[in-house]
Amino acid sequence: MSPRIPRVIKHEVLIRPDARIRIHLESKGSELVHLAITLEHEVSLHDWRAVVRYDTEGGVLHRDRLTPSGDYLTHRERVQMGLDWHQARKNIFDGLVSRAEWHIGEYRKLLRED
């Protein structure tokens, strides 16, 4: 039996002129190896910065909120999806789209404080 070859999917979706969601998914067969979904904001021309990131680093799905300097505003907030990773990915994506304005607004407040 040959070893399963990892499948990597990278996708980027522009959700408004200054906001995009980047998806990085790695799986082996039906097993999720790594998932990262990041809401990014273009603070100036071609300067995209991570605002919120969901990922499975460390083996647990969690959310990090980031500051303009790249530090953690919140770190490793556990996320309970209780679903298969296909549905979790969809729920995270949909949640980021629906809350993008709020997340970016909070991020921009921090930009003004810097």
Regions found by a protein language model. Name each.
Residues 6-12, 18, 22-24, 55, ...:
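Small/flexible residues
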Residues 10-12, 26, 31, 40-42, ...:
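Glutamate identity and glutamate-enriched acidic tracts
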Residues 31-76:
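A short, structured beta-strand/loop element
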